Amino acid sequence: MSAVGENSSDPARSEAQKRKEGPSDLLGPSPKRSTEKRNREHESKYIEELAELIFANFNDIDNFNVKPDKCAILKETVKQIRQIKEQEKAAAANEDEVQKADVSSTGQSVIDKDALGPMMLEALDGFFFVVNMEGNIVFVSENVTQYLRYNQEELMNTSVYSILHVGDHAEFIKNLLPKSHVNGVPWSSENPRRNSHTFNCRMLVNPHSEAEETQDHEAQQKYETMQCFAVSEPKSIKEEGEDFQSCLICVARRVPMKERPMLPTQESFTTRQDLQGKITSLDTSLLRASMKPGWEDLVRRCIQRFHLQNDGDISFAKRHQQEVIRHGQAFSPIYRFSLSDGTIVSAHTKSKLVRSSSTNEPQLYMSLHILQREQPVCGMASDLGNAQTMGKPMNPMSSPNTAGSSCTPQGQDATISSNTSTFPSPGAQKEPGAMHRFGCPGTMSHSATMQAATPQGSGYPLKLSSPSQGSPGMLSPRHRASPGVAGSPRLPPPQFSPAGSLHSPASMCTSSTGGNGGAGANHGYTSSSLNALQALSECHGVSHGQSLGSPDRKLGSPAAHSVAVSHHLINKMSVPESFGEQNQSEQGTPGQDEGIDLPRDEKGNLGQFGNLDGSDPQSRLRDNKSHTKLLQLLTTKTEPIESTSPPPMAGGEPGCKDGGAGNGGMGSQGGNGSHATSLKEKHKILHRLLQNSSSPVDLAKLTAEATGKELCQDSAGGTAGVPELAIKQEPVSPKKKDNALLRYLLDKDDNVLKGKGIKMEPGEIKEEGGKMTGIKTEKTDGGYDRVEPSSELDDILDDLQNSQPGLFTDSRPVSLPSAVDKQSIINDILQMTGESGANMSPQQQRALQTAVSQQNFPAPRPGQPGRAPPVRSVSLDMNMPPKGAQGQYPMMRNNNPYSIMQQQGMMGNHAVMPNQPNMVNAGVMGNNGPRVGMQQDGWGAQGTVGSAASPATAAPAGQHSLPQGALHSRMVPNPATGMPMRPNSQPGPRPMLQPQMMANAQSNMDMGMAGHQFPQQQAPPNQTAPWPDSVMPIEPVPFGNQSSSMYGGSQEDVLCPPASEGPADEGALLSQLYSALKDFDGLEEIDRALGIPALVGQAQPVEQDQFPGQDPSMMMDQKPPMYGQQQYASSPANMQQAGYTPMQDATFHGLQGQMGQRPGYPMLRMQARPGLRPGGVVPNQPNTLRLQLQHRLQAQQNRQPMMNQMGGVSNMNLPLRPNVPNQGTINAQMLAQRQRELLSNHLRQRQLDQQRQQQQQQQQQRSLAMRAQGLTMPPNMAAAAAGMPGAMSNPRIPQANLQQFPYPPNYGTGLASPPPSTSPFSPGSPNLPAPQLLSHSAMHGSQMSLANQGMLGSLSGQFGAVMSPQMQHSAFQFPSSGMSQQSDGGFGGAATPQSPLMSPRMGHAQSPMMQQAQGNSSFQSSPDMNGWPQGNINTNSMFTQQSPPQFSQQANNNMYNGNGMNLNVSMAANSSNMGQMGNQMSMSSMNSGPGSGMANMGPEQQKYC
């Protein structure tokens, strides 16, 4: 114990013991001891580091006098860690509040990195670009296309200054170069600026983009103000290297309207003159930098005014030059002029003499012209009259703006036009001659103005010409509401059309004050709408506008008095400006001033239209209109005199202008002076009429129109009656006015407009009251260019509708009819243009066809004055969305395959789309003859296409139909009446549909075959005649049988096509689809309106069922809508039907109204549709909508018995075999086959269900295989594929058939697989997506069968059987009908086994092994589409080339991926010959050579679609 005690109690001893032990331990190396030592050292080291970390940051270490011990350090560490954790908890709690605990800021990102950038850009509403120090764009995001219409590739590695406005280069350099200028200066010094500096710059919008095709050169200089947020050199990038330090990283977004800086009130440009005062150079960079539209017009008018205005006997310019030479500098007094939009501009000029630096001799003098736009005020009218008179007359002729100038004074109108004004102006500029002719010529002053405006503002003329413009509702509320519009630089172009009418009230004010003196003033606002109309008719809503706008205007408005003042001046001005048109008339009467002014006004209009443009169809129209006006003036001579003031307003009519307006400045005089002048002028007018009238009959008509037609109203337009009328009408709602006017125009136009385009106008104007000018314009328009007017009309209508829905909301009911009217009017105008409907009809057809086929309409539309008036007739046709307008004809051509469907839809589904129901009901769909009848009868309500349709009906139908309008304008009216409600909501949808229709029409036109089928139908409604042949016919054939089936099952499909058409107006299409589909009642209504139930019932009871169950949704629109990219699921039907409708047509004829363009080469027509589709590959964008629609349609259709589907398939197959054209036989065969199939269908369906289950399993396997190959197969497709295996097998049999027929793959399939087709679909019926599945599986199945059978032909056969309704078209469409046939095969596969006919085929197809093998191989092979082409070739022996097989493969993939399909279809469509089908198919295959690659690409290709 002692020892223990000692040890424990004696530290010295224990220490000694330890020491003793220590040495003994240390005698040898001890791993344990060395490890402990090492650990202690490390521990000390870490503690020190920890101390540094813990205390260094908090400066706590200084608080310790001695080095903290480990314990203190650890304690502090724990403390700080706790604090950090508490802070994190608190932060997390806050974050939970903000994020609702859904996402942790530190959690894994829910958004994919790749998607984050685009999402951010979308949220910012901008695009991203990086510019290096040299100013080259190193990178730009893909969405730049949305803003600048440039593709990413176009801008990459190009100079940013090429798209920057010259005025913004310095600003951009300032933001870009600081880095390069820093030269070693620390970047940190610039951090505040670099981190985020925001600046605005103007970026050039691609002038060559399709949307701008129709714009004139001014459009080519269109800039978009972008707000750029720039970061010069983020730290993260800075560290990566020098290269990045010199980059400017920017996000550019459109400057929100509310954020847009107020445009500078003053604008300026400089000129350089020699000592004689001759301008040697002109610098407009400052003006251009202002980015105000119409700056060219501003410069032109300013210079004209400066040089032409008389100040005593010397012009400002001359006096200015003398002063400069004498004093070395000069300041001009303030002078005023008006722009084409009616904006008054005050200007003064400063000049300075420039001397030679060496000799000190004066060399030249520089002039700075400072311009100030004034807000239009009614009171300013008189002032404007004088100042503007000079500039306006000359300008109207010279520039689109000038044309618009006639209505320019109406600032209100400008507002309406402002939406489309900008691009309309370019459009107008494109065809300045036509435009100016229209705008300048007072004869159809209103019409001229409208027309001029129309070319300039595609949509505006519509407005002017349409009743809406005439109606106070449109005009007076609008113009009153937006007087500023007139002043808006942007407004001028739009002014032309809508602006004119809108601004006509202002014009009335100005006109009345200036041109009409007291009378106009009396009109004041009471007859503002009337005044607007008058102003419109005068071409210049405002007095100044009148004189400037055109002689007509001068006469009819305050401009008239100013005309007297500067009559010769105006003539001079107009000479240069009007391209001699206006000048001629004006020059003829310059000396006469007022008296001459009046005649000149009328003559000028007539002369401009008639004399100068007389040779021109447009001129002729103008002449007619002017004649009518003249006659009216003559007949209602006293009336105009009586109301001097009103005449200017209503003076849009010749009478008005002649009487009161004619005196313009004299207007204040009242009737007396006016009367004398008016008598004198009337004699001249009468003489002119006699001289210019095409025939005594014409003259008689014109006279009747002027006198018998409501002289009072006509006069009212031109005389005291006008104010009253205007006043009376004004109280009436604009809609009523418009409707009345539309009805009058439509009813009248049918009979009168055609015979006497001009004549109609006065009458219309009369009815319109305030709308005189609008009507007049319409006629004039008709007179213009049969082709151009409609195109322009459509464009304008569309533009107006889209850009100014609010404006048109009032008149929407009218506007809807207006849309129909638009078309009707266009057609009528086309008829009218020839002065007789018949005369112009061929021309119209040719021109329209040309325009449609060329897709010129966008360009022609601005340049087609004729078109503007029709739009006016349509009563502002604002219903037509700009897109529709542009795309109406161009759209026809532009639209994708869906367009074609759309067109059908429009025609067939006019219940939904005003045109469609009637088309179907009227039998337009049924056959060519009926279609015509339908257009006239069904559209009978509309009466004449453009003019007869009731305003409400016409407008709605017109909206749809105008684009298709030309196609089915007549048909549209009645459906339109049913559809008026729809047009309001349909403006968006309808435009899409229109474009689609147009696209269809285009395709059809291209095909010619389709067009020919229905040319007759269309011909009756002359308006459609021009395009109808090519456009309408396209739809008609499908409409015959397909129409009802198609529409029966695919009302939504019809709408869907618009959705598919999205590319042109995806938003509109989507909204259209949404509005159409959002309520089932609407769809049912549409179906009923289309007569789909009846058509389906009578045409193909079985087919109908099949169709509704499968075809309409799948084939019709579902496919197109459903698969924008996978066109074949969504568009396979379309593509097949469109691309190769012949095969599918026969079968589809019953099965799918749409697909059933079955008349042998209606199919081709359908091809046209696909052709459009290719054009509409972009339209595939609305795939989501389409898919939804398709699913919905398919769901409905699939719910129907598979038997029916199978029956439909069999029908289709049989017709295919006999050739689609034999529809009757096909129907019989189809019915027989269907009956047979129906008998075995139940069994088949049961078996198919079982088989399908097996197939689905197999399909799943195949899907796996396909996926492995990169061909992702959607479940639907998988299911379809499962069904397809049998079909695949079937293809062998169909294969033979395929080989037998030009479209053997499909045809053979169709024949062999009709029952299977049906039955396969029946089995598919359970699967709502079955159609899609079939589409996809058709594609893949085709490939699978290819793989299994090693032959595309076999594949085609399979698909023919399986997918006969939907895919068969595809199959038929494509040389390797693998695509469409696969669908058939899918269908046939399941159903065929039971089908006695199909049993052989089905034998192997149905064998599960076969199916599996096929499915697997098919899918596997699908990636190897190119490889398959060999097989395909075999299968498509009919298409001996591998290319067709390739195509088939492509088709399959394309169907799946939509892209290839679209391409293929478009190829087929381009072929535009059913007969060519075989060749086409092979050709398509070849065309699809790339497609094959795409097919191989499969999913990838889908992306492209």
From Swiss-Prot:
It is found in: Nucleus. A motif (LXXLL motif 2) lies at residues 686-690. Residues 27-84 form the bHLH domain. GO terms for molecular function: nuclear receptor binding; nuclear thyroid hormone receptor binding; protein dimerization activity; transcription coactivator activity. The modification Phosphoserine is found at residue 695. One of its GO terms (cellular component) is nucleus. Interacts with the thyroid hormone receptors thraa and thrb (via the ligand-binding domain). This is Nuclear receptor coactivator 2. It comes from Danio rerio.
